[in-house]
A protein has these predicted regions:
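Helix-coil modules at protein/domain termini and other flexible surface or pore-lining loops
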Residues: 1-161
Length: 161
């Protein structure tokens, strides 16, 4: 008897996007505005872990259908008046192209601290897998939240199914 093979959704493309948002009403509304700026607010975002499949290629931003189930690796930071917040992703391919890794950083970070944390995390992820990685890329957003509002920064690696 033949065993059925499990079907897996394996993305073939991905793109990076980011946004910032502020709201006088709530942190959730600031997050919604950051997603709007990033161009993914009208998707049903599905958070996934930090592995880029083999042969998955990076592409330019793509408009996605409203309501689409959309897998993302996301970093987001939310803050109140006067706080500095940062979110970022670092991604890189294993030297032989077997897979890619994505590291997320989010919280109360300025630009320098965010970059340092991203570099340390992607390096440790590779070391844990005995990988050598090449061409580390980064995307990040940092914001000092204005007085009287909530702020949010978001960075997402969006898989295209």
């Amino acid at each position: 008897m033949r065993r059925a093979r499990a079907t897996a959704l394996v993305p073939r493309e991905f793109f990076l996007t980011s946004g910032r948002g502020i709201s006088p009403t709530s942190p959730m509304n600031a997050f919604d505005r950051a997603l709007m700026e990033a161009g993914i607010a009208n998707c049903n975002l599905l958070l996934v872990s930090s592995i880029i499949p083999p042969k998955c290629r990076e592409r330019r931003w793509k408009k996605l259908d409203a309501g689409a189930i959309t897998p993302v690796v996301m970093a987001k930071a939310i803050g109140g008046p006067g706080e500095t917040i940062g979110a970022g992703l670092a991604w890189a391919w294993e030297e032989e192209g077997r897979m890619g890794l994505v590291a997320e950083v989010e919280g109360h970070y300025d630009r320098r601290a965010l970059i340092t944390a991203l570099d340390a995390r992607i390096k440790e992820m590779a070391e844990a897998r005995n990988f050598k990685i090449k061409d580390v890329k980064r995307r990040f957003e940092v914001m000092k939240v204005p007085q009287g509002v909530f702020g949010c920064v978001v960075v997402a690696l969006v898989f295209v199914l």
